Amino acid sequence: MTSKVDTGGWNKLENKLSDSTLNTINRLGFKSMSPVQSAVIPLFMSNKDVLVEACTGSGKTLAFVIPIIEKILKRETNLKKTDIASIIISPTRELAIQIQQVLLEFLNDLNRIDDQNDLENIKTLEDELLEEQEEEENEKEEEEIEKKKKKKKIEISSLLLIGGTDIYQDLVNYKNYGGNILIGTPGRTDEFLTRVVRNDQQFKFKEFEMLILDEADRLLDMGFHLPINSILLKLPKQRRTGLFSATQTSEVKELARTGMRNPFKVSVSVKHIETHEDQSIPTTLDNRYMIVPVEERLNQLVHFLLNHIDKNKIIIYFLTCSTVDYFFKILQSVKVLSGKPFFSLHGKAPHSQRIKVFDSFSQATNGCLLSTDLAARGLDIPNVDWVLQYDSPQDPKAFVHRIGRTARMGRDGNALIFLSPEEDSYIEFLKIKKVPLVEMVKAENVTNVLPEIKKISFNDREIMEKGVIAMVSHVRGYKEHLCPYIFVFHRLNIGLLATGFGLLYLPRMPEIRDKTLIAEWTSGYTKDQILKIAYKEKKKEKQRLEKVNKIKLKKEKDAKERQDAINEKKRKLEQQEADKLLQKQQPKQSSIEIQLKKQEEKKKQEQESINEILHETQAFKKARKSKQQKKDKSSRFSDLMGSDTEQNNNEDEEDEEEEDEDN
């Protein structure tokens, strides 16, 4: 069902908003509701589940923050500080922090108004008490007045649950300060709820009312299915659920079927004023493209920044974290941009640094933020005038989210994407996706900054290495495009790309297989010059030189060992050849020598046998002589001892003779 939404003032809502909420809305400068707010807030206030599809920058955050607060304010009984009434899940820490900041705008105003009302109520009640005491002494009325006087003000507490902090500290904060509204990322929120239930077996979500899944399509794209399902199982089924998304994917619809009951589908579309055609971007956004070869892209970027950075807030999107790091260094170093405010933001930076950069750029009146798609969704950076896409996003869905950082909530904005001539079919592809673009002709006679960039790299090895790493990551990221029929990898000119990056040499990588390109491509610097490039940081350069010297010594040692092995092998071969030659020259002499040697060995063996026989013969004769002497002595002794003894001696002699015979 399609209908036109009345985007009137906030006081036109059927369910009237509280004074504190209206005061905060007025203070923030929102004079009227956006289409998504006009459609969603009444449904939420009427206890309906909602499945919302709306373009980025349409005011989705207020569409769920306001109903959450109003539902708590309209409760008959006040919440305890540890009663969990609502949970808001976001895909990233940065978006969770931003939602928390918006929520605190309302909660802080609510507490200030309650403090003022308490003072006024006390005075009024005291006056009424005096008047009633003068009129009549009614005990029942006095008791009612005392109850009113003791009535507590409404306090709503919130708790931020994101990674990078200690989960035990979150539990302590919850116990001490409460958490009626939880805002967090899926993993940390699920872990927190698990520990709360584990620590208090009696804990139940008795007061729970609303669950919000912000950027639901991205939650599922990032693989948060398990923690989201775990959270859904913990929460009571009697609740209100809101799914907010820029696109309604099949996964989002499946999640809606499992986690919602008869949801109202809200789809807010935008029509172009002149063509009256539906489009996926705000009508206040001037969306453009520029056809520019990769080797000229950096020159066009510098020219663009010179004309816009002083008076505008600009976000430039790159394909990878490494390209953000490299171009952040390069743009700061170019003379014509010296002193200009540059910021960098990507997923590999520490969380504390990302928060600091985000806050600094948000508060700046002008400047340029270089980022990956980390800052493409959900983040509400105020007053962004230009979004420039130096590289096309891998996922075409990210295109709309990138340009959605400008032209938010009815403000004017501008967007520009660089495309090479080989990528021009992307324009028609986006048009089919209801994202129209108009051409912005590239500037002529722009300053060529590439020689200066090469010189910058030549003077600092760190920047040179960052450039090489950036190009490798860019090439591999380009290869993984989800629109490979538009961004065809084999049509990417690696040589011109390296020139456009201002590299001093081509990196070694499997993607570069063109041997002719490797042989012919040059930056104008020789290999010896590149090897001598030093780090500006002395400590780092000292370590590099030590490493180079160590590698050099190892190479020399390895070379010496290889040469020694070659020489030894050569010597052995020469010796073998010499032996063979010697055998050929004196074959007969060698034969005679061998025969003589054999004869000598034979004679030696025969002599040894003869000597052994002679030795045994001499030993035998000596033993026999000794026995004869013993026999003679025995004969003389037997004559003295008598015939018995003689007989025994005869027996002994017989035994000895037998032994001699045996021997």
From Swiss-Prot:
- What terms describe the molecular function in GO for this protein? ATP binding; ATP hydrolysis activity; RNA binding; RNA helicase activity
Gene Ontology cellular component annotations, sorted alphabetically: nucleolus
Catalyses which reaction?
ATP + H2O = ADP + phosphate + H(+)
Where does it localize? Nucleus, Nucleolus
Compositionally biased intervals (Low complexity): 583-594
Short sequence motif DEAD box: positions:
214-217
Kindly give the InterPro entries that the UniProt entry links to this protein. Answer: DEAD/DEAH_box_helicase_dom, Helicase_ATP-bd, Helicase_C-like, P-loop_NTPase, RNA-helicase_DEAD-box_CS, SPB4-like_CTE
Q: Where is this region: Disordered?
A: 556-663
Q: Which Gene3D superfamilies match?
A: P-loop containing nucleotide triphosphate hydrolases (3.40.50.300)
Write out the domain note. Answer: The Q motif is unique to and characteristic of the DEAD box family of RNA helicases and controls ATP binding and hydrolysis.
What is this protein's name?
Answer: Probable ATP-dependent RNA helicase ddx55
Organism, per UniProt?
A: Dictyostelium discoideum (Social amoeba)
